[in-house]
Amino acid sequence: MTVTTSTPSGGGAAAVPPEDLVTLTIDGAEISVPKGTLVIRAAEQLGIEIPRFCDHPLLDPAGACRQCIVEVEGQRKPMASCTITCTDGMVVKTQLTSPVAEKAQHGVMELLLINHPLDCPVCDKGGECPLQNQAMSHGQSDSRFEGKKRTYEKPVPISTQVLLDRERCVLCARCTRFSNQVAGDPMIELIERGALQQVGTGEGDPFESYFSGNTIQICPVGALTSAAYRFRSRPFDLISSPSVCEHCSGGCATRTDHRRGKVMRRLAANEPEVNEEWICDKGRFGFRYAQQRDRLTTPLVRNAEGELEPASWPEALQIAAQGLLASRGRTGVLTGGRLTVEDAYAYSKFARVALDTNDIDFRARVHSAEEADFLAAHVAGRGRDLGGSSRTESGGGAGVTYTSLEKAPAVLLVGFEAEEEAPGVFLRLRKAWRKHGQKVFSLATHATRGLEKAGGTLLPAAPGTETEWLDALASGVGLEEGGTQAAEALRAEGAVIVVGERLASVAGGLTSAVRTSAATGARLVWIPRRAGERGAIEAGALPSLLPGGRPATDPRAREEVAALWGLADLPHRYGRDTGEIVEAAARGELQALLVAGVEVADLPDPTRARAALDEAGFVVSLELRPSEVSERADVVLPVAAVAEKPGTFLNWEGRVRFFEAALKPDQMTRRLAPTDARVLQMLADAMDVHLGLPDLRTTRAEIDRLGAWDGPRAGEPLQTASALPRPAAGEAVLAGHRLLLDQGLLQQGDEALAGTRHAARARLSAATAAEAGVKDGDVLAVTGPAGAVELPLQVTEMPDRVVWLPLNSAGSGVASDAGVLPGTLVRIGPATPAGAAPKEVEA
């Protein structure tokens, strides 16, 4: 038989040329496979299952367990089929046809079981254990070993999330190879030698990897277990439901295991085109936010005394309807970036149909009008499942996928830190660097751990200088060695420029990114941080866009949408964005706010946002759990979590990621928890407005009927760079981004996950630290107009008079505590002990 290889992200199958094939015989069956194929893989293609423990298709071969040994004609002894490649004319006999191979496999199994404990009745792996299964299928009924089994103290916590039972380990090295090869975190190793060999960590070196949970899942025995799941359930007691991760924009496939209406664990699903078989720990363990005791289960309304009290759904909906009707045309809608496509579409339609406004925005973060223009021109309506050419006239690319990103010869990251903001993208970049030497360049203040693990090159950029850097890369003029290499690499076929949401804070940054893409021929892709942002664009949850990427000010676009929605026309006025909605509400220009899943601390100016909520005459909050918004709302309506509802996420590729409800709507809360779209439908009915979105199927059908906009696109972003701040001695320009594990609300409820957060540290260059009178390890005070953030200092190679802070980590609420945003000037100096006078910093 001739084997074909498929292109994972589309494009159909490509036949392997005959000169690249070798033909061999396995158990009497002839097969032709590409050169370099392992014997164990060739056997799989014939349907022959060879037992194994150390082998994994996404890890480099190790031959550690020896369970997969087969007989190869011409060889003096059996060989490990996971380490030998197929050669032309090779004849292989597996345990099915070779007594030699069968006896050898029995011997290996007997050896592995000598010290393995009889823990199966209590082991978390029992019922889904490869060792258990293969001991039955390829082992013997008795053992010649009669001595006392070796035991160790158990379990050993190698992190707050991962527990190690050393006596169960079969030394397959899957966990160590994953950590070293895939994640780039060689924090666990096989230590000692011979009979003393075991998995362990270095002294005082905890297993602080964002991907540690994958080692639990790929462990073929119960040696590594989850601290949060240990002894909680048995595999055969669980109901498994396929799902999609709701955290970042990667769209990772997951498997949700639940029991008696409660999610017990979440695993990575096998999705070769997206996350392969890996997910980050945030996606694996970050699901308990929906199981907290403060979960909202019933509507709340504010009574005459100003207190929120429980109410029935009809009562709450009627009060909300009256308040919104009284403010029609003067209501702002803030949806946040975590909604499904269907829910975001419902908000978009509700804003236009029920509230008669284009004042709607999903961007609960730093944003700009330039970004809105960029999204309309280069993102909306483009992507893997949305159409659009793979290369636009401006050089941007709508066809960038995980696979094309992995195959790219060079990648430039701008305003984007892959490991912290899209871990699945980071794993592909690291894999590409390891496998074919992909060149990664990053415009950033310092080389992050993720950049170093991807073999990347830092192009040091102070906040605001990204525009200058991009223009220099486009022209190829005025660059030093690293920049020259990047400019040349970006001109190679298939190169990619990745821009993150943080580039919106740099005036002219996105405009320059488009110019650089056009000048170099590199494809341009935008990767946001949150799961719902890409879908919100297509749903029209922006002041400038209607569903399908239609410009809100285009007459034909409005006519198309109005006709489908049964309206004479839609609002004409260009709507307000998030910042403008907040400001208008704070000034009393808006009378009501409809807020969905937005946390005040995430907004660019939390203080002004609180003022907006206080000044707005009427606030309706759709929420899972109490928040600063719900505490100030007049009506609070509870909604379903991701595990409780079906829906769709659109990942950064533009790939549609459908998922069904893992739980029935009332299983988690014991009360009805409707989707956001269902709540809006009931609210529209109470307002006597026809929304026409009674269920998911109807909503999806309506979105499909609208389709993507085929008319003229919105104009290109045209923004020039602004003047850069000039810090004096004792001052610095603030830089920062959010870490993957921080103070986010969707991470609450899992103490084990919180235990592996990276410590929050401030960063300064050596020269700036000396100028400010601090040294490595000292507590640095970063002071803004609202107050100060105090963190331990880590002296780092980075531009002078720039200070980097994690934006939402413990003790580092930059916007809330200091009242500043990246790109602004702050004062820096040693933290002042309580009761002491502040030090003067000499100019």
UniProtKB/Swiss-Prot annotation:
Its cofactor is [2Fe-2S] cluster; [4Fe-4S] cluster. SUPFAM superfamilies: 2Fe-2S ferredoxin-like, 4Fe-4S ferredoxins, ADC-like, Formate dehydrogenase/DMSO reductase, domains 1-3. It comes from the Bacteria. CDD domains: fer2 (cd00207). Residues 100-139 form the 4Fe-4S His(Cys)3-ligated-type domain. The keyword NAD applies. [4Fe-4S] cluster 1 binds at residues 116, 120, 123, 129. Binds 1 [2Fe-2S] cluster per subunit. Binds 3 [4Fe-4S] clusters per subunit. [2Fe-2S] cluster binds at residues 54, 65, 68, 82. [4Fe-4S] cluster 3 binds at residues 245, 248, 252, 280. It catalyses: a quinone + NADH + 5 H(+)(in) = a quinol + NAD(+) + 4 H(+)(out). GO terms for cellular component: membrane. Signal peptide: none annotated. The keyword Translocase applies. Residues 20-98 form the 2Fe-2S ferredoxin-type domain. InterPro entries: 2Fe-2S_ferredoxin-like_sf (IPR036010), 2Fe-2S_ferredoxin-type (IPR001041), Asp_de-COase-like_dom_sf (IPR009010), MoPterin_dinucl-bd_dom (IPR006657), Mopterin_OxRdtase (IPR006656), Mopterin_OxRdtase_4Fe-4S_dom (IPR006963), NADH_UbQ_OxRdtase_75kDa_su_CS (IPR000283), NADH_UbQ_OxRdtase_ferredoxin (IPR054351). Belongs to the complex I 75 kDa subunit family. NCBIfam families: NuoG, PRK07860.1. This is NADH-quinone oxidoreductase subunit G.
